[in-house]
Amino acid sequence: MEMDTLVKDHLHSQAKINATPCDEMGIEQLIATFSESEEAYLQKTAKFLIEWFSPQEFLSLHTSGTTGTPKQITVRKEHMIHSAMLTGAFLQLQAGDRALCVLPTDYIAGKMMLVRALVLGLSLELFPPSGTPFAATSDNFDFVALTPMQAMKSLGELHRAKKIILGGAPISAAMEAQLQEIPTEIYATYGMTETVSHIALRPIAPKARHSRIYTTIGKSRVWQDSKGCLVIDCPEVAEEEIHTHDVVRLHGAHAFEWLGRLDNIINSGGVKI
């Protein structure tokens, strides 16, 4: 297959998906196997892998509505690669770390788990998106991304992951208190499709590190508009300033507290309510 040069240059030699090495032959094998599967989540993964390794510079993504009405946008593969590298550096992920993906790979959160595996050299296990993500496997993992809803239904299993990032919906105070008791590094993320996943994180657990303040990653800077909403400049993952409907309290140019939505819209498991 003809691979995008940038993508090929950033394909880590230790990357694996479902135990298959992600060299050129392995990628072709994964695409063929997943395309022929009756499982919709594998078919969607095959579609993304085809798009990712194609010569096209951009990918089309659907936004969730954080910055306004949900719409289709195009993002640079280069920005997705940068995002993966920033997350890897912040969380100190290592090549060979085991990762679990139980998020839909037709949306940015699931797509970025695939990109992180390919770029950082993770060994990624794919399972169907589920409200009980650990039910399908008895294995332990170094890195997992979940929605708060998935985490809430898996409180007794979260110790099986060394590092967990949560995103896609607000985390209630009651849930946050429960999460603090788990012996795992757990982070709340802030981001959106326009920033190809998160641009800031805050620690939830362990309890000693808990904070309400998000810290930006990479070169991202933040400020407020006249309505008190967050504005983001994140040159590594987006070409333009991003104006959100999220009301925040600033703590300098690289930290903020999330106070709520100007339009009172929140996301829950990827569904707007």
Language-model segments: residues:
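Conserved coil-to-alpha-helix start sites within the AMP-binding
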Residues: 2-23, 102-119
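Conserved pre-ATP/AMP-binding loop-to-beta segment of ANL
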Residues: 44-62, 95-96
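Conserved ATP-binding/catalytic segment of the ANL
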Residues: 229-273
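AMP-binding/adenylate-forming
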Residues: 77-82, 98-153
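Conserved S/T- and glycine-rich ATP-binding loop of Class I adenylate-forming
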Residues: 63-66, 99, 114, 144, ...
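Gly/Ser/Thr-rich phosphate-binding loop
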Residues: 154-207
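Conserved AMP-binding A3 loop
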Residues: 58-85, 92
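Conserved ATP-binding loop and adjacent catalytic segment of the adenylate-forming AMP-binding
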Residues: 184-227, 237-241
